[in-house]
Amino acid sequence: MYRILALLILCSTHIAQSQSFSCSNGSIPDNGVLTAFPVAVSGLPVQADSTFGLKSVCINVTHPYVSDLEIYLECPDGTKIELSTRNGGSGDNYWSTCFYDTVAGRINNGNAPFTGSYRPEGWLFTANNRQNSNGTWNLLVRDAKPGVDAGFMNGAYLTFAPMPFSGLALQSSNLPIVRINTYGAGIPDDPKIPAYIDLIDNGPGQRNYIGDKGNIFAGPIGIETRGSFSQTLPKKSYGFDIRDSLGNETDTPLVGMPSESDWIFNASYSDKTFLRNCLSYHIAQQLGNYASRFRHCEIVINGQYQGIFILLEKIKRGPGRVDIANLTPADISGDSLTGGYILKVDKQTGSVTGGFPSQYPPYNGGPTPDILYEYPDGNTLVPQQIQYIQQYCDSFENALRGIQFTDQFLGYRPFIEVDSWIDYLIINEFAKNIDGFRISSYFHKRKVNDGGQLVMGPVWDFDIAWGNANYDGGDVISGYSHLYSNTSAPNQVPFWWVRLQQDPYFSNRARCRWESLRAGVLSNTALFAWIDSMALVLDEAQARNFVRWPILGVYVWPNPAPYPSTYGGVIQELKNWVTNRSTWLDANLPGVCIPQSLDEGRSVELRVLAYPNPAREHIWLVGTFGEGSQVHIRIRNSLGQVLFSETQPASEGRILIQPGKYASGMLLIEVENGDQRATARVFRN
């Protein structure tokens, strides 16, 4: 009995004491590659948490210009903590430099040579996330200016101790609170891991408390990190799906948003206003288009405060999102084959499952962009569907590139919903979104009986828009993002946008739309009222966020200088962009707005176009029909025999005919509208 008691006392004394573990010395190569200096940790409590965990990291590094260096700590579960990146100016060396969460002086405000105690750029307490302390930790060092001078790691050590700094304590918030428990696991890129979520929102004007029950939703989810470049940032964005007790995805409404299973927590790390995405989606919604609904919230993961996030709807087919028909592998003919499809121009990363190249190069001479499958994905589409959607897009591009592209019937207009393309252009050019036409550029196609055209949108991904990018002219008030000039970039803008602007119909219509919107929802008064109201809602939580992530007044890729040191400063910076960019577009957006009344009373010759051509079962007729007027249609075969005859009312200049299963070959379509006649030819497979 006494021996057991003595052993327990010895073990508890051992655990209660600080313990340090060191790495070996070694060269820091001058090659721009991360070099790992492993630290083997053993004999500690299995779980690193607020009772016993990582307390400090001390390093000794020699290098003639330490501002060349990026230094991180990588935990056994893959969590990466930024210690110091590109700090120190022209000074040298880190000598007996120790990082503590509790020190007031931040390393990025210090001067080289660095010695003594500093607060790291990240937070050490994020390592104490209930992961197993025992294992291999890595000090990662990269010389970001290769080919100049090398350095040397003279040793480093990690100290684990009782009661380390446990982070920021969130007690209550005016925003919804999200608690996530991953059961001690790190959150990977892929696949999703199981977790449990509590979403708390007590309603307008009510405070939400960290101890409240999850009254909006409480239950299992699958969660992963998401994004491309954003995966490298300290504050991660997450994708998650809501699951039932058996692990199957299940649709659930969240904080006033329609029921669905797939959602996103956007970290908004580079956008310190937390508003650039939201402003863009708000504008799209005000213009009558679908864009992701959003709600700001504060998140705690495994007991650790993570800051402000934006809960977003993921772009997805569905009645509450992109409202197009469900396309199944069985839909291989007739109207069922014609929709719905979601496509995009985007990076070839992440969950890309195929696509096809544009038929024509971009106007700047760069690489030809690809059109990628989003819904259904390339693994689900069957050959007939792939052939159909590719041929439709090819027909659109051929019509747009052709010499008669401005023609109402022979050009591109029958293939696209023009007004959706105009709204997409306006939103992305107002924001001068340098990614907007070449990355995360979504469009979709409806079934023929629902219009059948290519609809541009939803708009997506504006973190580095609205003047928040210091490259490719993203912070320059003048110019257009669809005239992207960087030919060395792997992702280019399709030729569509330049060509569309060469059509007076399109540019004049876009100009009229802009002028109309500037008198209302896009006026400075309306936009500033929205921005100010959102900033007021976020004001309490932003203070906590920027203690957790102390990046105000600090460069974060790709913020342009100067870097405002207050939240009010970054909000004013956004409003300045709105003022200056809108003024520039007022003066420079192409086109002339011709009042509708000037076109009234003109006699228009009857013209008609049949598409698609070749046709399958359904045929659309587009013509200069009077709205609601009765149009008589006859279809003849090559022998002159009448195969089909009926009268239909015209709607928006279009008529859908379903002639049935007649012989294949060339068909002549005769159209009568009042005392005017016209014909069209179509080949039917």
List PLM regions with ranges.
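Residue-level detector of functionally pivotal "anchor" positions at catalytic/ligand-binding pockets or at interdomain
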Residues: 165-167, 587-611, 626
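Middle-to-C-terminal accessory/interaction subdomains
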Residues: 173-176, 185-188, 193, 227-229, ...
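Internal "kinase-insert"/substrate-recognition segments embedded within catalytic cores
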Residues: 180, 241-247, 253, 258-267, ...
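Residue-level detector of buried hydrophobic side-chain packing
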Residues: 71-73, 139, 158, 180, ...
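Bacterial Sec-dependent N-terminal signal peptides
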Residues: 1-22, 598, 620, 666
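Conserved NTP-binding catalytic cores of kinases and kinase-like/nucleotidyltransferase enzymes
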Residues: 166-274, 279
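C-terminal outer-membrane/trafficking sorting elements
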Residues: 4-7, 602-611, 615-685
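Loop and turn regions of beta-sandwich accessory domains that flank beta-strands and are enriched
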Residues: 19-167
